[in-house]
Amino acid sequence: KSFSYDWSLTLSYSRNFKEKHELYVGLDYNVAQEKSHSYTFQVEGFPQSNIKFLSMALQYQKDGKPTGSESLNRRIGVTGNVNYIYDNRYFADVAYRMDGASQFGSSKRFAPFYSFGIGWNIHKEKFMENVLWLDRLKLRGSYAVTGSVNFDAYQALATYEYYTDDRYRYWFGSHLQGLANEDLEWQKTDKWNFGLEVGAFHNRLKVTADVYTNQTNNLLSEMYLPLTNGFPS
């Protein structure tokens, strides 16, 4: 069973002035939650094959027992962005976002992300007016820092496993299964992109070329540790 919600609030302002200037300013607020839980029962000994309700079973399967899992992820973010166009020739945009997620360590849950880009419509320049066969010639470039969450909900918390087969005075025991990591932080990727767009002969011929590079920092991966550490990974 799962339940989730994603709420967003957007404020925006745009204006054209002096016939050549276009400005857009936006502010976005977002909050989301994903909650899920599941239970598993393995039983046997039903009186008839068409009676499958759990309470009608005779017993649990051999070495079987009820199992279950649950997860809760929460995320919040605020984004501001500005776009500017001059005379439909020059473009610029800037965005900044502060993001927070519950999966990370208590001291690393929030992180900033940002991007900026520029563009140039060369075919709009006066020196291109006599090039009649060319409909579009645009150069663009951008840089961005993005983040991702690619692990379980409780990866940064200390986890315990219960002993259910052995008891002491009717009480369960437990042992530490995973260490807490309050410094578990966002995996960030630096992205560079440079592009060229060409349209010719009434846009019968179109060419788009991109050169890009992505570099990920603080890459998260699973490691298997020696048993002498007391933890498998």
Predicted features and spans:
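Extracellular/periplasmic, surface-exposed regions of secreted and cell-surface proteins
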Residues: 1-233
